[in-house]
Amino acid sequence: MRTDKLLYGAAYYDEYMPYDRIETDFQMMKAAGMNVIRIAESTWSTWEPQEGQFDFTHLTHMLDSATKYDLDVIVGTPTYAIPSWLANKADDILALTHDGPSIYGHRQNMDITNPIYLEHAKILIEKLMEVVTKYDCVIGYQLDNETKSYDTCGPRAQAMFVERLKKQYPDINEFNHEFGLDYWSNRINSWEDFPDIRGTINQSLHAEYRRFQRDLVTEFLAWQAAIVDKYRHKDQFITQNFDYEWHDYSFGLQPEVNQYDAARCMDVTGCDIYHPSNDFLTGREITACGNIARGIKNANYLVLETEAQGNIEWLSYPGQLRLQAYSHIANGANMVEYWHWHSIHNAIESYWKGVLSHDLAPNRTYKECSVVGNEWKRIGSHLVNLKKKNRVAVIASNEALTGLVEFPMQSKTADGYNTVLRWLCDALYMMNIEYDIISSHSDNFSDYDYLFVPALYSASENELKALDEYALNGGNLLVTFKSGFSDEHLKIYHDTQPHIICKTLGIKYDQFTYPANVKISFNNVSSDAAEWMELVTCDTAETLCHYDHKVWNTYSAVTLNRYGSGRAMYLGAMFGENTLIEILKDFFKDDSRLTSNEFNARYPVVIKRGINGLGKEIVYLLNYSDKDQSIVNHKSKCIELISDCPIHEGDTITLAPWDVAILEF
């Protein structure tokens, strides 16, 4: 989805304010160069205080005021936090989960398959749409909020799951065989005897239920989109604020949603990206999570939520908020919107601070937002709709993620897959190599010169054959440990590991262990092996380094195979980032276009580039450090857009701490 301007703003909640100050707030937003707000998604109990009694006073107040101040509005459907009167209508509206029955109070605690919930959600959305569709300031709609299945395991959901299995496996014997249910006498000889899924010890069956739960999310969002679509104007978009696996901040692929499938009902991908700041600001999360969002539709995306002040430990240093905003745009976002405008005075998110603090007065954060907004008013037409053509892709897989939740690595945590994903992504980031993140089910592998495959533990034979074909036909393939081990149902393949791609990689193994006192060294850069190691032997591959260990030193840690007209590298263990970077330098060594840039810039200066809507090349120079950084322009003459100054070939560009320069060629 193309837009005619960069969108910059914040979520706004008139219904949370201690007093009516909307005139002051919107005047402040306009002065700060903000042009968009998101409203309505969080307060069903305000819009419908009792069943059938609707009160949209706050809603129309915001819309009328937004019209007055020429602010665009994104309206959220308020279905993720239900009112108490609805929770009391039936015992099964609140979800039954693996942990037991949900209790009213928290958000996202309902069963999204419950027909009573769905009936009332539909009524509310329709009533809301009848109000907002009259306003020209509304540019789009956000479906729900960070939607999940909320681990619904009630009788209804489980019955739906069984019906789905019956359609997939008309022969119940085939089902038992595929899922290995003879083990521990778990065999099911009649669908009517299907046990409660919460008690299963069969990871294949449990993973299948997790897949079913992800599909519930896809169906729920498509159901909402169909309702909204009846009312929206053709120039209004539909989106959703997808989020990520959470490590006290946004980290990686969301385990509970297949976002590639769920986004099909939407015009544009939206996302919520939160990350460390101050001394811990690196830009890694902005890039990795943004790349997931951009890759969902291979298009520009909207950052519907990110931190202004945020959690207590996220308070940014001067200049960082501006750097973060430009980093999102440099990555392909067309919007940066803060959660939220004002810091809330009650309840669980009181210390998740907005642009304004609790005193609601202009502050340092607001002033820095004003710098960003007014710069974007001036130069945004040169930055919006940035198009990227990256040569490196990292594939992502919900099935593999689930597999490593069910069968974790050494640390026994549920985030093993994303740890491996980010291991590769962050090394590329530190090398100033831009990359896409695409689905493992993608049919466009051949669009990329390099394809990275992190821990593809669960993969169908078709997926593995696609990797083989990619390398055979000239691609540069990099595969990590724990790939090609089990099929799409977590049944372990019973031939040479890794299945099918053992020939591609020119290696094999049949034993693995947790590393202890094992090091891996490459180009004199050494680090400890961690999490997992496979005892790899080479068939046609070349060993680049062995394990440094008194016993395991005969086995290969890193290998490279010439295969067809391509190459395939295998990493048999996880190890330190510095060692990984040295190995990647070797993998890329014959590709100077990838490993060098016209500025000889290295991290902490991050380079991002693309083609703008005017057809010109844009290069961002982002200083992720608290020290001045100097970069020499070895390209042709250009314009630095923020200062509107010419930069000639050979000129030195000096970036202040946490500063940014934008070059247009």
Give, region by region, the residue ranges found by the protein language model:
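N-terminal carbohydrate-binding accessory modules
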Residues: M1-V36, P49, H382
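Short, well-ordered coil/turn segments that N-cap beta-strands
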Residues: D4-L6, G33-N35, T67-V73, K134-I139, ...
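The substrate-binding groove and active-site-proximal loops of carbohydrate-active enzymes
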Residues: Y8-M17, S42-T57, I103-H120, T147-D151, ...
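Short, acidic/polar
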Residues: Y16-M29, S250-A262, Y317-A325
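Aromatic-lined substrate-binding rim segments of carbohydrate-active enzymes
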Residues: E23-K30, R38-H98, Q224-Y231
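Polysaccharide-binding and catalytic clefts of secreted carbohydrate-active enzymes
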Residues: D99-V268, D272-D279, G283-E285
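Carbohydrate-binding surfaces of carbohydrate-active enzymes
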Residues: F194, K234, A263-F665
